[in-house]
Amino acid sequence: MAEDTKDTTSSNQMWGGRFASGPAAIMEEINASIGFDKKLYAQDIRGSIAHATMLAHQGIISGEDKDKIVTGLNTILSEIEAGQFTFSRKLEDIHMNIEARLADLIGPAAGRLHTARSRNDQVALDFRLWVKEELQKAESLLTDLIAAFLDRAEEHAETVMPGFTHLQTAQPVTFGHHCMAYVEMFGRDRQRVRHAIEHLDESPIGAAALAGTGYAIDRHMTAKALGFREPTRNSIDTVSDRDFALEFLSIAAISAVHLSRLAEEIVIWSTPQFGFIRLSDAFSTGSSIMPQKKNPDAAELVRAKTGRINGSLIALLTIMKGLPLAYSKDMQEDKEQVFDAAESLELALAAMTGMIRDMTVRADRMKAAAGSGFSTATDLADWLVREAGLPFRDAHHVTGRVVALAEEKGCDLADLPLEDLQAIHTAITADIYSVLTVEASVASRKSYGGTAPDEVRKQIKWWRGRN
């Protein structure tokens, strides 16, 4: 798709009747949005076809003019998709570029298309349609990522690994349980996407500049034709509203934060020091100087894109925060933020799904690490509560002394002699050793939502029925 970016001071704008001279070259440059809003060409044409069809149905334009308009718009769609359309900066935006070309193709009938319509409701329509499609893509990509995690969780429902708090070993869990935590996160993201689709499912076309129109239009007809549930209810709010864009960016930002947390774990876990996973060659790169390197660049780039997405959200919030009703030109700056965030989110979700499916899980390294850091200390305290009748706070104190002794001796809890344990508390018996293995610890966590393999499988089954 070619673009004419020449500076000009000629006045051939479609709003130029009130002006005696054309805009300055720098005004054209700052005012033009065609460099980015040409991305909305398909939505703009789709909306114009629906609008023209409604105008003819209502007797506002003739059927003959409607047919010319629809034919011309379809020709323009083909030209753009074939890369044969020249976009002009002096025509400002996608709406006026298409309308100008339509006038070239069909003559005066093109001038009837904008009857009962403003660029204010036109751009609101185009942008809503585009965001709706992007939300549907995000829903599909999140579903794919959830499916990848469900498969890994099922495969590793019994694979023991260390669970962490403060990035310090806390308690043994299973890798399947850890995977299911991300299923919950991304499941919430997907639910937010679905709610956002419901929220924006109202057609803005017909609100005109801000006050509605005196023509006998049928907004319900265009809403139905464009796949919306209903038209918006207040014309001032309709052209002022960018909540749908802010909601998209909010969802993208939350999803990106989840992706970033996951990416951080992938980066850490793939280091030789952890060695919990091995990334496939397909999602790694090498070094230009160090032949041995295998870098987790895909995960790092996913982590970095979170900054871009969060920045887009803050940018649009700041753009919108002081705008009086209804439309202001500031709102032209909304699209680049959403376009960039949508592209970043799509890349990040697809890359992460590939990494999760392709990575090798090193169960032996996970299990070896699971017992480090006295990870079964809580099991020892729970045993003292159950078997010796100690209040939990007393059991916590006794266990702390046992941990200190093991640390002093440089051994695991299970390696301490019984006499050393009994010297700390006489109620301790040899039965204590039965709860000090990581396998026993994991198996005991049978509470709803816990890490015991059977509980993990219940979680997987629940999600299988909803994915």
Swiss-Prot record:
Keywords for this protein: Amino-acid biosynthesis, Arginine biosynthesis, Cytoplasm, Lyase
CDD domains registered for this protein in UniProt: Argininosuccinate_lyase (cd01359)
Family matches, as Pfam families: ASL_C2 (PF14698), Lyase_1 (PF00206)
InterPro entries given in the database record: Arg_succ_lyase_C, Argininosuccinate_lyase, Fumarase/histidase_N, Fumarate_lyase_CS, Fumarate_lyase_fam, Fumarate_lyase_N, L-Aspartase-like
Pathway, per record: Amino-acid biosynthesis; L-arginine biosynthesis; L-arginine from L-ornithine and carbamoyl phosphate: step 3/3
Catalyzed reaction equations: 2-(N(omega)-L-arginino)succinate = fumarate + L-arginine
Compartments, as annotated in UniProt: Cytoplasm
First-listed, main subcellular location of the protein, grouped into a coarse class: cytoplasm
The protein's enzyme class: lyase
Transmembrane residue ranges: none
EC annotation from Swiss-Prot or TrEMBL: 4.3.2.1
SUPFAM superfamilies, alphabetized: L-aspartase-like
Any GO molecular function: argininosuccinate lyase activity
Source taxon at top rank: Bacteria
Keyword Repeat carried by entry: no
GO cellular component: cytosol
BP GO annotations: arginine biosynthetic process via ornithine; L-arginine biosynthetic process
HAMAP family given in the database record: Arg_succ_lyase
Membership in a protein family: Belongs to the lyase 1 family. Argininosuccinate lyase subfamily.
Designated name of the protein: Argininosuccinate lyase
